[in-house]
From Swiss-Prot:
It is found in: Cytoplasm. It comes from the Bacteria. This is Pantothenate synthetase. Pathway: Cofactor biosynthesis; (R)-pantothenate biosynthesis; (R)-pantothenate from (R)-pantoate and beta-alanine: step 1/1. GO terms for biological process: pantothenate biosynthetic process. The lineage of its organism: Bacteria, Pseudomonadati, Pseudomonadota, Gammaproteobacteria, Alteromonadales. It comes from Shewanella sp. (strain W3-18-1). NCBIfam families: cyt_tran_rel, panC.
Length: 281
């Protein structure tokens, strides 16, 4: 696997592949990789001739008092895992490479509406940072296909909307959430959990499952939401949000809607965990 922090190196290699008529997949990450990331890379390797991965802890998507400085950097272990998974080109830029003028002078991309609810309401500016860096990375790598995890459901819809609105010639593929045996969604932030917190963490997925089951049995959105919140508090969580939305638009779900997604963010100790459950009724 080739590793470079320089934009020109990435473009040169991708151009060489394209000159031979070969396809390029891209998996953007912030590093500290787990099996969920590796699954994205393996899926990408099956879909395209070549796989490019980026590791960049993006300062633009972190708010004040968030965990930018504490976010784990594990490049050596990540590189080894990516090589085994089938990645051929790893882009490891610095903030100065991505934002040479600094954040205050950076042109940004903002996806209105869908970026302003749920995590966007709890973390103002977060999706501006996500959309901006992903757009920049797409312009640098110029992939045919890009892979993202369904665990970050709102992020996936933000990126799909950005690609559609800006007419970017990139196919966006969402990959199912990878979970630990307990049901806990794999996340780089699971490392913040203590042993006792990790034992309690599967209650988040169980709450979503119970909500979906209740809705299918005819319970109201309000009933299942209150029951789920109570179960989360009992397990030691402090919910940030727990909402039922239209699966395609993230608009507030209506009783007649068939395509639904339950989205949750909740604090457990120092960790802010997110999860979702997409279902039809």
């Amino acid at each position: 696997m080739i590793t470079s922090a320089h934009i020109d190196d990435i473009r040169t290699q991708v151009r060489a592949w394209r000159a031979k008529g070969e396809t390029v997949a891209f998996v953007p990450t912030m590093g500290n990789l787990h099996q969920g990331h590796i699954t994205l890379v393996k899926e990408a390797a099956q879909k395209c001739d070549h796989v490019v991965v980026s590791i960049f802890v993006n300062p633009m998507q972190f708010g004040q008092n968030e965990d930018l400085d504490a976010y784990p950097r594990t490049l050596a272990a990540d590189s080894e895992a990516l090589t085994t998974a089938g990645a051929e080109l790893l882009f490891t830029p610095t903030p100065a490479t991505i934002y040479p003028k600094g954040l205050a002078q950076q042109t940004f991309v903002e996806v209105p509406g869908i970026s302003e609810v749920l995590c966007g309401a709890s973390r103002p500016g977060h999706f501006r940072g996500v959309a901006t860096v992903v757009c920049k990375l797409f312009n640098i790598v110029q992939p045919d296909v890009a892979f993202f995890g369904n665990k970050d459901y709102q992020q996936l819809l933000v990126i799909r909307t950005m690609v559609e609105d800006l007419s970017l010639p990139i196919e966006i593929i969402g990959v199912d959430t990878i979970r630990e045996a307990s049901g806990l969604a794999m996340s780089s932030r699971n490392g913040y959990l203590t042993r006792d917190e990790k034992a309690a963490a599967p209650a988040l997925k169980k709450a979503l499952d119970a909500m979906a089951a209740g809705i299918k049995q005819g319970e109201t959105f309000e009933q299942v939401t209150e029951q789920a919140k109570a179960s989360l508090y009992a397990a030691g969580f402090t919910p940030d949000y727990l909402e039922i939305r239209h699966a395609h638009t993230l608009a507030n779900a209506e009783p007649e809607d068939k395509a639904l997604v339950i989205l949750a963010a909740a604090y457990l100790g120092k960790a802010r965990l997110i999860d979702n459950l997409r279902f039809d009724r």
